[in-house]
Amino acid sequence: EKTVATRQKSVRAAAERQLTVTDSFLTGSYRRQTLISPLKQADVDIVIVLDSSYKSRGPRAVLDLVRQSLIEEYKKGTKISRNGQAVTITFTDFIVDVVAAFPRPWWAWDSSGLDICDSGRDRWITTNPKRHVEISARANRAHDGQLVPRIKQLKAWNRNAGDPLHSFHLEALAWSIFGTSWWWYNSQASDWAGARYFFKRAYDKLSTPLADPAGTGKDIAAYLHGDALQAARSMARTAFERCDRAQKALKEDDPATMHEAYRRVFGDCYTG
């Protein structure tokens, strides 16, 4: 954690030396406390909000500018590449994604959000990472601190299954299934057995759009379609069946079968 704190400050300072930055902050799963180890397999996300004068260059050119600016700072020895919606810095111990953003105009329907670069389609897309952090914290409080550990368990399943879901999609799906406020939620404990409910609901929910809970109007699940969608649903169904098998084994006083079933779902993260 100390390494991440030091590194993210260094990256933000590097960007600020090269560009006119009006704000910068840590975001993503690290900020929402849902990052799972090992850190080397994860991304740490940083948003840099740039002066509006850069925006006329267009999304792809803005990311190229950020990339070149960071190359000037880090020189040789560090891989820095444009990667979809971010500039990716590959350090030896973990990866940092630098997301270039611009404030939404005051008259926009979501003026508290940010426009970020989608270099693949050379377009701007709207997001609101600070609101995502607020939603995550509120949801975790509603579940008496048990939702963040639950999401980490689900991310362990996702990694063990070959990452069929994007990390944030998985989190938003968990918010949708378990609820995000004290007056509407499905109470959860962070035991392994409780994940069974998620997989049961996810099988159906994965086949429908999932609106960004921050109110940006974006479908978080839009990337998932065709064979990839069917594979993700199949994996959720398999995980449900294995969790169900584990619960039946527990009732039959067969701990060995229970542990094996959970281990097949959660991989090395299962500590039972």
Language model region names:
Residues 24-34:
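Short, solvent-exposed beta-alpha or beta-beta edge segments that form flexible loop/patches at the rim
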Residues 146-264:
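Conserved nucleotidyltransferase catalytic core and NTase-mimicking acidic/glycine-rich helix/loop elements
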Residues 63-113:
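Conserved catalytic core of two-metal-ion nucleotidyltransferases
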Residues 33-67:
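Catalytic metal-binding acidic patch
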Residues 10-20, 65, 69-73, 156-157:
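Generic non-transmembrane alpha-helical segments
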Residues 28, 78-82, 167:
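Short beta-strand
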Residues 1-25, 150:
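Helical scaffold of the NTase/Pol beta-like nucleotidyltransferase catalytic core
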Residues 99-145:
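Acidic/Ser/Thr-rich, low-complexity mid-to-C-terminal regulatory regions of eukaryotic proteins
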